[in-house]
Amino acid sequence: MSTLKKPDLSDPKLRSKLAKGMGHNYYGEPAWPNDLLYIFPVVILGTIACVVGLAVLDPAMLGDKANPFATPLEILPEWYLYPVFQILRVVPNKLLGIALQTLIPLGLILIPFIENVNKFANPFRRPVAMGFFLFGTLLTIYLGIGACFPIDKSLTLGLF
């Protein structure tokens, strides 16, 4: 059973909306029941089947058993905390390291006020926001990679 709405292109209201880039919900395939009853369960059950199949075919080993009397040389946090760990490790004053980390959300809050343009505009036409984003992304990757190295090689990533 399929219900498909076809557009009535003789309707002047629909034509004016289509000219403005709107009105696309007047025609096409409805989400209920087609997507919600048929496609979503197939995707969900397929994902569960893939995860269970991979878990059965290749079970992950848990690794070595913990020895409370032998600690590693350097304890690293989880991978998503590497950039923060690197900032705290490299900055000589810990209070300054925490202050640097508070600048990140403050900078994100200030971006809309610095570049006051249409929020629906093409992101490539927003050079200040794109510059902040690219700089922040590259800095985060650099700090995350640097956290994996010993502290004497962490700033140069072992290249120099």
Swiss-Prot record:
Q: What membrane topology does this protein have?
A: Multi-pass membrane protein
Q: Does the keyword Signal apply?
A: no
For this entry, the protein name equals Cytochrome b6-f complex subunit 4
PANTHER family tied to this protein: CYTOCHROME B, CYTOCHROME B_B6 C-TERMINAL REGION PROFILE DOMAIN-CONTAINING PROTEIN
Name where it mostly resides. Answer: membrane
The regions listed as transmembrane in this protein's record are: 36-56, 95-115, 131-151
Q: How does it assemble?
A: The 4 large subunits of the cytochrome b6-f complex are cytochrome b6, subunit IV (17 kDa polypeptide, PetD), cytochrome f and the Rieske protein, while the 4 small subunits are PetG, PetL, PetM and PetN. The complex functions as a dimer.
Instruction: Determine if Lyase is one of this entry's keywords.
Output: no
**InterPro entries assigned to the protein according to its UniProt record, in alphabetical order:** Cyt_b/b6_C (IPR005798), Cyt_b/b6_C_sf (IPR036150), Cyt_b6/f_cplx_suIV (IPR005870), Cytochrome_b_C_euk/bac (IPR048260)
The record's gene field reads: petD
